[in-house]
From Swiss-Prot:
This is Exodeoxyribonuclease 7 large subunit. Belongs to the XseA family. Its EC number is 3.1.11.6. It is found in: Cytoplasm. One of its GO terms (molecular function) is nucleic acid binding. Keywords: Cytoplasm, Exonuclease, Hydrolase, Nuclease.
Length: 445
């Protein structure tokens, strides 16, 4: 047996290598051909052959993609298909797995679409940096679409269910045909210039590439890019892409999804609103409590500085001054009484009659007449001086100036304060030229 240095492979290893080689060597490819041997088993996948006059290739389109086909695949139909080359390893079958397929008449439109998309992308119209964010709370929405299509019904139904408070303006337009793109562009520019709307939605239902061609118009794409109002594009089904989708600020796969993106679900808002209300109530109560405390402090300050408080303070001061004055007058009267008593004692001790008797006795004892005369004059001068001193402290002199000394007739005690007497009590008032009996009348003390 000959010795072999080459690697020996099993069929599965060889098929795996061939699959890796195919998938790594070929990018996404477009093929235009005729359908043949079309089958759709219960799994929902689509199997068929693409052929021309000289060759054919097996193809598969799995259910998630085949569901969105806009036509019914049939024998002999010419199509334009997009997919990747691969190898089904179990049988070693070389095949094309498709993710998109359309009728072949759309091929020229597809090439024009790809060329325009590449040019606009190179200009930066699709860049994420230039796209605007949607406002958190949309209040006014402009919807540009056909007034009779399924898209507008889906959008309005979702909006009414999720957030019926939204203000929606329907701007009716053609959505396919030669004049559709110009009409959509005009409505978009007018809505944007009005400044009335928070968001502008451009939408329509599904269709073929030719049906959706108005949304691949270059003028419309540039108008969307220039709009100051955020623009949402929801054209066709999830697998459909238009230039308006690429250039819009937000692309929604379907009209219904676009409506869901634009407004919150009112059922989800209820607990949020309740939490906000509870928080607002808490803040209001806190603010009210602070305001009431501040009002109480201000009220205390106002009461402390009010005229009534000032009068009360003055009244208390007046009462205190009255008490002090009464006490002072009592002290003065007591001192005057003491001085009167001392003066009376001094008067008694310096009685002129007694002093004169002594002098006369001394004069009789003196024999020389001249000496007696001088002594007598000296004593008279001294007597006058003493009399003046006594007169200065004599309470009767104070009475002579208009004052009175009030005493009780029963015991002769001096009345020093109005608080010591009672209404109706009889008293004696000593005046300069005599005394009078008085009676206490009720009144202010």
């Amino acid at each position: 047996m000959a010795e072999r240095n080459e690697q020996i492979l099993t069929p599965s290893q060889l098929n795996a290598l061939a699959r890796d080689l195919l998938e790594g060597s070929f990018p996404l490819v477009w093929v235009e051909a005729e359908l043949s041997s079309v089958t759709r088993p219960s799994s929902g996948h689509l199997y068929f052959t693409l052929k021309d006059a000289r060759a054919q290739i097996r193809c598969a389109m799995f259910k998630p993609k085949s569901t969105w086909l806009k036509f019914q695949p049939r024998e002999g139909l010419r199509v334009l298909a997009r997919g990747r080359l691969t190898l089904y390893e179990a049988r070693g079958d070389y095949q094309l797995v498709l993710d998109h397929m359309e009728e072949a008449g759309e091929g020229a439109l597809r090439r024009a679409f790809d060329a325009l998309r590449a040019r606009l992308a190179a200009e930066g119209l699709f860049d994420a940096e230039r796209k605007q964010s949607l406002p958190a709370h949309v209040q006014r929405l402009a919807v540009i679409t056909s007034p009779s299509g399924a898209a507008v019904r889906d959008v309005l139904s979702v909006l009414a269910r999720r957030f019926p408070l939204l203000e929606v303006d329907l701007l009716p337009s053609l959505v396919q045909g030669d004049s559709a793109a110009a009409q959509i562009t005009s409505l978009l520019q007018r809505a944007d210039a009005s400044g009335r709307y928070d968001v502008i939605l451009i939408t329509r239902g599904g269709g073929s590439l030719e049906d959706l061609w108005a949304f691949n118009d270059e003028r419309l794409a540039r108008a969307i890019a220039a709009a100051q109002t955020p623009v949402v594009s929801a054209v066709g089904h999830e697998t459909d892409f238009s230039l308006s989708d690429f250039v819009a600020d937000v692309r929604a796969p379907t009209p219904s999804v676009a409506a869901e993106l634009l407004v919150p679900d009112q059922r989800e808002l209820v607990p949020r609103v309740r939490r906000a209300q509870a928080r607002m109530t808490q803040l209001q109560q806190h603010a009210l409590g602070n305001a009431m405390q501040r009002a109480d402090r201000l009220a205390l300050r106002l009461r402390a500085h009010s005229p009534q408080a000032r009068l009360q303070l003055l009244h208390r001061r007046q009462e205190e001054a009255g008490r002090q004055l009464g006490a002072r007058m009592t002290q003065v009267l007591e001192r005057l009484q003491a001085r009167v008593q001392r003066g009376h004692a001094q008067v008694q001790s310096h009685n002129p009659q007694r002093h004169l008797a002594g002098l006369q006795q001394r004069l009789r004892a003196l024999h020389p007449q001249a000496a007696m005369q001088r002594r007598l004059q000296h004593d008279q001068l001294q007597l006058r001086s003493i009399a003046r001193s006594l007169e200065a402290v004599n309470p009767l002199a104070t009475v002579a100036r208009g004052y009175a000394i009030v005493t009780r007739p029963a015991d002769g005690s001096v009345v020093r304060s109005a608080a010591e007497v009672a209404a109706g009590e009889r008293l004696r008032a000593q005046l300069a030229d005599g005394s009078i009996e008085v009676r206490v009348e009720p009144g202010e003390r």
